[in-house]
């Protein structure tokens, strides 16, 4: 698989490409599948439809990897927190984590209750072309913790940070508990058939450097180290969003570092490029315009060359992006990097 070879810095015939949120609302096929499911959460839980949605971007766009269709919040959901998705607003937990008692009341073994995810993986792997990789994923302990404490996405993360500074032991207990679940969750995804795993630290940028390293990065390192120990041949991709200013402190046993669009790629290459493969980092809104798209691709390929790079966006696909431009992006990257 070209994608897997690229994760390990091996020579590839061209630069592989996939896109974060490549299965999404910009595809009418996705909209139809979601309609059949009835809701976003039911779509995640319906393995037949989730498989359909996982495969759509590979079939329509020609990307080099499929990423499992699911949601990072299924883990806290199966730990006992009721979750709903509010239209035009997003995820919302009906109860929150406020103290040590509420952390202790979380159910352990959530990874044993996520069979609908593993079924989607095995179905997808059976149907996916052998030369295409399947990526599994989870959210980082810190990002999951913020949702569990705030009840939803936040602009200030005030409750999470209040706990971090005034009751750090409570937050560490929660992060430890989540890390243990995530190690087993990703292990079972690998056993079900994924070829690589990715950890999304979507709210990494909520923390100053010292707090980030202690309350997020240390846990990411712990998870990736254990996974590499268990499954050395499975690439681990980490995507901490918005930590461009902290790159000099990034270390650990993983293979690919996801670069968001706000971080200069030249800088990431200079600091991390010798040690890790870089993934990213096209600004997603360039997909609205073909000229802007071409210019962005040219710039990235000039910096990265043919090795040590997986092409991706620096954030997820937006719901109203023209699908023909997404398809054009895949062709553009393949054609420009063939050698």
UniProtKB/Swiss-Prot annotation:
InterPro entries: UROD/MetE-like_sf, Uroporphyrinogen_deCO2ase_HemE, Uroporphyrinogen_deCOase. Substrate binds at residues 21-25, 71, 147, 202, 315. This is Uroporphyrinogen decarboxylase. It comes from Helicobacter acinonychis (strain Sheeba). The record marks 71 as: Transition state stabilizer. Homodimer. It is an enzyme of class 4 (lyase). GO terms for molecular function: uroporphyrinogen decarboxylase activity. Catalyzes the decarboxylation of four acetate groups of uroporphyrinogen-III to yield coproporphyrinogen-III. Pathway: Porphyrin-containing compound metabolism; protoporphyrin-IX biosynthesis; coproporphyrinogen-III from 5-aminolevulinate: step 4/4. Its EC number is 4.1.1.37. It catalyses: uroporphyrinogen III + 4 H(+) = coproporphyrinogen III + 4 CO2. Its main location: cytoplasm. PANTHER family: METHYLTETRAHYDROFOLATE:HOMOCYSTEINE METHYLTRANSFERASE RELATED, UROPORPHYRINOGEN DECARBOXYLASE. Belongs to the uroporphyrinogen decarboxylase family. Keywords: Cytoplasm, Decarboxylase, Lyase, Porphyrin biosynthesis. It is found in: Cytoplasm. CDD domains: URO-D.
């Amino acid at each position: 698989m070209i994608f897997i070879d690229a994760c390990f810095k091996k020579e590839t015939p061209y630069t592989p490409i996939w896109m974060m949120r490549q299965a999404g609302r910009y595809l009418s096929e996705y909209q139809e599948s979601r309609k059949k499911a009835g809701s976003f959460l039911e779509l995640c839980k319906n393995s037949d439809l989730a498989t359909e949605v996982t495969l759509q971007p590979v079939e329509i766009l020609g990307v080099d990897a499929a990423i499992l269709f699911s949601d990072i919040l299924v883990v806290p959901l199966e730990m006992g927190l009721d979750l709903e998705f509010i239209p035009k607003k997003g995820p919302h937990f009906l109860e929150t984590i406020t103290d040590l008692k509420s952390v202790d009341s979380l159910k352990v073994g959530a990874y044993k209750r996520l069979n609908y995810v593993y079924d989607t993986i095995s179905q997808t792997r059976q149907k996916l072309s052998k030369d295409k990789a399947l990526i599994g994923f989870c959210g980082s302990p810190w990002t999951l913790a913020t949702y569990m404490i705030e009840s939803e996405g936040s602009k200030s993360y005030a409750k999470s940070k209040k706990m971090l500074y005034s009751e750090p032991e409570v937050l560490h207990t929660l992060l430890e508990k989540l890390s243990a679940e995530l190690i087993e969750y990703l292990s079972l995804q690998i056993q079900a058939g994924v070829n690589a795993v990715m950890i999304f630290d979507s709210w990494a940028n909520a923390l100053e450097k010292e707090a980030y390293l202690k309350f997020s990065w240390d846990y990411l390192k712990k998870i990736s180290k254990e996974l590499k120990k268990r499954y050395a041949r499975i690439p681990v991709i980490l995507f901490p969003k918005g930590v461009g200013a902290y790159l000099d402190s990034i270390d650990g046993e993983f293979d690919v570092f996801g670069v968001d669009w706000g971080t200069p790629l030249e800088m990431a290459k200079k600091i991390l490029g010798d040690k890790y493969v870089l993934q990213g980092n096209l600004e997603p809104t360039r997909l609205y315009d073909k000229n802007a798209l071409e210019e962005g691709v040219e710039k990235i390929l000039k910096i990265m060359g043919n090795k040590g790079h997986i092409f991706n966006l620096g954030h997820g696909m937006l719901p109203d992006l023209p699908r023909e431009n997404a398809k054009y992006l895949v062709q553009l990257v393949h054609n420009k990097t063939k050698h």
